[in-house]
Curated annotation (Swiss-Prot):
Keywords annotated in UniProt: Acetylation, ADP-ribosylation, Bromodomain, Chromatin regulator, Citrullination, Coiled coil, Isopeptide bond, Metal-binding, Nucleus, Phosphoprotein, Repeat, Repressor, Transcription, Transcription regulation, Transferase, Ubl conjugation, Ubl conjugation pathway, Zinc, Zinc-finger
PTM characteristics: ATM-induced phosphorylation on Ser-824 represses sumoylation leading to the de-repression of expression of a subset of genes involved in cell cycle control and apoptosis in response to genotoxic stress. Dephosphorylation by the phosphatases, PPP1CA and PP1CB forms, allows sumoylation and expression of TRIM28 target genes. Sumoylation/desumoylation events regulate TRIM28-mediated transcriptional repression. Sumoylation is required for interaction with CHD3 and SETDB1 and the corepressor activity. Represses and is repressed by Ser-824 phosphorylation. Enhances the TRIM28 corepressor activity, inhibiting transcriptional activity of a number of genes including GADD45A and CDKN1A/p21. Lys-554, Lys-779 and Lys-804 are the major sites of sumoylation. In response to Dox-induced DNA damage, enhanced phosphorylation on Ser-824 prevents sumoylation and allows de-repression of CDKN1A/p21.
Region (Interaction with MAGEC2): 248-377
Chain residue ranges for the region called Disordered: 13-56, 412-480, 581-602
Binding residue positions for Zn(2+) 1: 154, 157, 178, 182
Pathway the protein contributes to: Protein modification; protein sumoylation
GO cellular component: chromatin; euchromatin; heterochromatin; nucleoplasm; nucleus; RNA polymerase II transcription regulator complex
Official protein name in the record: Transcription intermediary factor 1-beta
Organism: Mus musculus
Length: 834
């Protein structure tokens, strides 16, 4: 199409220039003489249009058909060529807009100053610039040309003899006599004389004669006037003008037009390339918009997940506090009701005795009546203790400001340096956010920056985030990249978030590339930190105590990273009842956090370099994804396809030797095989028919591992992971303290003897509950032990069917609550004496 358009443009431009610059003396002859180069250029344009590079049938239709009526241009339709190189019938051009009073005799058009709109491209042009389309005029004039050439006479002599030959060099028709003379003259004897057609010079092109000298052909090209002339006109009207022979002029003009066509073709190819690049950029911009939408939805999903998790923690904490108060009040109410009934009976009997007329009976029963009356008066009834008010505290203004500052979209121009997100101004002015390392610029890089205040009303300062510290980073690099991306949907969250709910405190840092996930740091509280440019929060900074007489549900003072490797906590954290304190580098082991204790922690986070991104193999997540469900540490993790729990290879039960596939399911989600099909004749106690104690069968081994993995993943069981490493437990029972880690080692046959039956496994777990129960006097802890025991028994029953393990579990002692000052002897009767 480019070659066709270029050839057509060049040929039409040459035709228009020649017609416009014709002299008055050779007006019609000049117009007719232009048919020779014009026809040649039209043939070249037609060939280019029909080639594979051409525009096809539509481009050819625009060249040979009217742009208005779509009819083929014929001489009888008076075809016209506009300056924009579009063709149209003279009748289809329509009336011109008058712009001047001058009229032109060219085809009866409007005045020279009138404006005409092109029917194809709507470009305006002057009517004087519209010329006749000589290419299409010659298409139907072959017959008339042949009849005219048949009567052509010789022009070399005065005899008017019919011409039988034609000299190509002289462009003259010759008779037989002149041909012989032509071949005798030394100057003309080498000329080419054709006898095939007296008036034919080329196939498809007829000879054009001068309109002044009717018998003289147009064989010269006047360079000064830029028009075709005959020999007589060149000697008279164009005397002393520079001229060329027709063949030389055509050759030179073709070279000039070919050079222009080549230049325009190169420019057109560059334009096509740029057009493709712009179209590709449009698609890239659309892809960037979709990717930004996905990033925003992913950030919102992560925030809602953290809100859901935090909401469950707060609800559980409130439930624990209220359950203890409710149980104590119920026991007090039961005691008071019993005393009340006893006093009512004494009052009723004493009143009945006083109203009785039997004086003898009154005197005989005086001792018993006095005894019960004095005994009832001695009973001490404790007053009702006022219970403190419990309320949920949160800063609405801070959360509103945090929501208003939720992220930002930064579009970087190509060539600019990426310096990372600047410090965001949070509601409570935390320390500045700094991102270490330098990153390469992207054509369109989306960066999200967040700054928020703390949700702890008693906190005096904000934690300072200086980056991310990786753990388990030396476990090797795995090629490839496969990440488990959660579905962006609100139906998966079981927390009802109303319109008044606010997002948690969080900060977002961009990934190293546009394909990496952004680092979202969730803050569920704040610890005391040095203001300004302080490095990290010092561990162990005390928080402000709660108000007296008010039960406050404590919030966790921790930070969680989503989409990037979370840092290992550097100090203990405040957790609910039976939640462990995260061990730091110098800690001896996990400890139980007292409900009344108040601690705070600092977290140092070191950001990874932007220029490098960790990669992982199929089925494995690097430490930037999440933390292990068992050990709560980052690293190379595998994610379950169903529950989306993440585990280290050695933390999962059974331990994984290789990285599983993408559709891997953990032991908690895997369907257990039927006990009867797997075990055969082997009983639950692990002994065979000969009475020799054997190891656990493969089916029982898998079921025990599933139950133990459920205990490891159960949040309230976290203090029981490593009881034996704590000095407190070692002093109570030296050498005999059990914890989940030792039970796992024995189940994996790392300690001897291994378990031989599920009952033995259940006995060890029950003994662990009993040991922990002896070490605590807190009623809430005892209540939690009862809940853990029920959880374990439920898991065992689910794994082993109808088999009951209640007998092997140690039942913790009942709660010894006060009986309002009454002993069992006093409530039983007066048999003890006064």
């Amino acid at each position: 199409m480019a070659a066709s358009a270029a050839a057509t443009a060049a040929a039409s431009a040459a035709t228009a220039a020649s017609a416009a610059s014709g002299s008055p003396g050779s007006g019609e002859g000049s117009a007719g003489g232009e048919k020779r180069p014009a026809a040649s250029s039209a043939a070249a344009a037609s060939a280019a249009a029909s080639s594979p590079a051409g525009g096809g049938g539509e481009a050819q239709e625009l060249l040979e058909h009217c742009g208005v009526c779509r009819e083929r241009l014929r001489p009888e339709r008076d075809p016209r060529l506009l300056p924009c190189l579009h063709s149209a019938c003279s009748a289809c051009l329509g009336p011109a807009t008058p712009a001047a009073a001058n009229n032109s005799g060219d085809g009866g058009s409007a005045g020279d100053g009138a404006m005409v709109d092109c029917p194809v491209c709507k470009q305006q042009c002057y009517s004087k610039d519209i010329v006749e389309n000589y290419f299409m005029r010659d298409s139907g004039s072959k017959a008339s040309s042949d009849s005219q050439d048949a009567n052509q006479c010789c022009t070399s002599c005065e005899d008017n003899a019919p011409a039988t030959s034609y000299c190509v060099e002289c462009s003259e028709p010759l008779c037989e006599t002149c041909v012989e003379a032509h071949q005798r003259v030394k100057y003309t004897k080498d000329h080419t004389v054709r006898s095939t057609g007296p008036a034919k010079t080329r196939d498809g092109e007829r000879t054009v004669y001068c309109n002044v000298h009717k018998h003289e052909p147009l064989v010269l090209f006047c360079e000064s006037c830029d028009t075709l002339t005959c020999r007589d006109c060149q000697l008279n009207a164009h005397k002393d003008h520079q001229y060329q022979f027709l063949e030389d002029a055509v050759r030179n003009q073709r070279k000039l037009l070919a050079s222009l066509v080549k230049r325009l073709g190169d420019k057109h190819a560059t334009l096509q390339k740029n057009t493709k690049e712009v179209r590709s950029s449009i698609r890239q911009v659309s892809d960037v918009q979709k990717r930004v939408q996905v990033d925003v939805k992913m950030a919102i999903l992560q925030i809602m997940k953290e809100l859901n998790k935090r909401g469950r923690v707060l609800v559980n904490d409130a439930q624990k506090v209220t359950e203890g108060q409710q149980e104590r009040l119920e026991r007090q109410h039961w005691t008071m009701t019993k005393i009340q009934k006893h006093q009512e009976h004494i009052l009723r009997f004493a009143s009945w005795a006083l109203e009785s007329d039997n004086n003898t009976a009154l005197l005989l029963s005086k001792k018993l009546i006095y005894f019960q009356l004095h005994r009832a008066l001695k009973m001490i009834v404790d007053p009702v203790e006022p219970h403190g008010e419990m309320k949920f505290q949160w800063d609405l203004n801070a959360w509103t400001k945090s929501a208003e500052a939720f992220g930002k979209i930064v579009a970087e121009r190509p060539g600019t340096n990426s310096t990372g997100p600047g410090p965001m101004a949070p509601p409570r002015a935390p320390g500045p956010l700094s991102k270490q390392g330098s990153g390469s610029s992207q054509p369109m890089e989306v960066q999200e920056g967040y700054g928020f205040g703390s949700d702890d009303p008693y906190s005096s300062a904000e934690p300072h985030v200086s980056g991310m510290k990786r753990s388990r980073s030396g476990e090797g690099e795995v090629s490839g990249l496969l990440r488990k991306v959660p579905r962006v949907s609100l139906e998966r969250l079981d927390l009802d978030l109303t319109s008044d709910s606010q997002p948690p405190v969080f900060k977002v840092f961009p990934g190293s590339t546009t394909e990496d996930y952004n680092l979202i740091v969730i803050e569920r509280g704040a610890a005391a930190a040095a203001a300004g440019q302080a490095g990290t929060v010092p561990p162990g900074a005390p928080g402000a105590p709660p108000l007296p007489g008010m039960a406050i549900v404590k919030e966790e003072e921790t930070e969680a990273a989503i989409g990037a490797p979370p840092a290992a906590p550097e100090g203990p954290e405040t957790k609910p009842v039976l939640m462990p304190l995260t061990e730091g580098p110098g800690a001896e082991g996990p400890r139980l956090a007292s409900p009344s204790g108040s601690t705070s922690s600092g977290l140092e986070v070191v950001a990874p370099e932007v220029t490098s991104a960790p990669v992982s193999g199929p089925g494995i997540l690097d430490d930037s994804a999440t933390i292990c469900r068992v050990c709560q540490k980052p690293g190379d993790l595998v994610m379950c396809n169903q529950c989306e729990f993440c585990f280290h290879l050695d933390c999962h039960l059974p331990a994984l030797q290789d990285v599983p596939g993408e559709e891997w399911s953990c032991s908690l989600c895997h369907v257990l095989p039927d006990l009867k099909e797997e075990d055969g004749s082997l009983s639950l106690d692990g002994a065979d028919s000969t009475g020799v104690v054997a190891k656990l069968s493969p089916a029982n081994q898998r079921k025990c591992e599933r139950v133990l993995l459920a205990l490891f993943c159960h949040e309230p069981c976290r203090p029981l992971h490593q009881l034996a490493t704590d000095s407190t437990f070692s002093m109570e029972q030296p050498g005999g303290t059990l914890d989940l880690t030792l039970i796992r080692a024995r189940l994996q046959e790392k300690l001897s003897p291994p378990y031989s039956s599920p009952q033995e496994f259940a006995q060890d777990v029950g003994r662990m509950f009993k040991q922990f129960n002896k070490l605590t006097e807190d009623k809430a802890d005892v209540q939690s032990i009862i809940g853990l025991q029920r959880f374990f028994e439920t898991r065992m029953n689910d794994a082993f069917g109808d088999t009951k393990f209640s007998a092997v579990l140690v039942e913790p002692p009942p709660l010894n609550l006060p009986s309002a000052g009454l002993s069992s002897q006093e409530l039983s009767g007066p048999g003890d004496g006064p």
